[in-house]
């Protein structure tokens, strides 16, 4: 929808609503159903070189499976975001390169999963993370996204944000872990209390200086949820639970609800509300 169209990491998307990597995004049939049912970007499930049978959340058929689907969908003007895991730096770099050459527009390094955290340990030090990001950046032409763990280890949030900016990372994928009792006046964007980071997504948006965009993942089940995520800094939202419960139609429903709320509040574009939350205190 025109009102929900955005530019994420320099890539034009027809909606700010997308699937979260994982649900309904691993098998050919479900990927094609998502592609047909929703106009926004399509996010692949995280993959490695040879595929995995476990853990269940990373079960996948391997990078060539996803690269083949990308090569089919990209000529049909589908914007694809591919997600990468691996248990070595070399594997992560290799997978990113294969997906990039298949034509995906954004390559996400899923550095948040325990599988990567416990093997590659990218957040063990600033130097380690910077070296990995630099290697991947040198391998791909697509925009680079980093999925951040809830607690990025030894690296402070401000230092991490500065590194994302310095290394040319286009997108930070963050948890939309807003307080359950958060009170937001949708019409004005006012939030009770003093200025404070409300979620990981909000915290990294505040540190971004507009250099990278933020995708908020989690807790988005309605158009209102998406609206609040946008108010607190998210350029786009990733939908998981609603997709599992409702199937592919959940994305279109949330997109339509968001579009309706934007219209009700006199907004011509979702871009008008990104980061516009204000504190009363």
Task: Label the predicted regions.
Residues 15-21, 40-45, 80-84, 107-109, ...:
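Hydrophobic faces of well-ordered beta-strands that scaffold small-molecule active sites
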Residues 44-50, 106-115, 171-181, 219, ...:
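Glycine-rich phosphate-binding active-site loops on the catalytic face of alpha/beta enzymes
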Residues 60-79, 124-146, 188-215, 254-270:
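Alpha-helix-loop-beta-strand connector modules within alpha/beta enzyme cores
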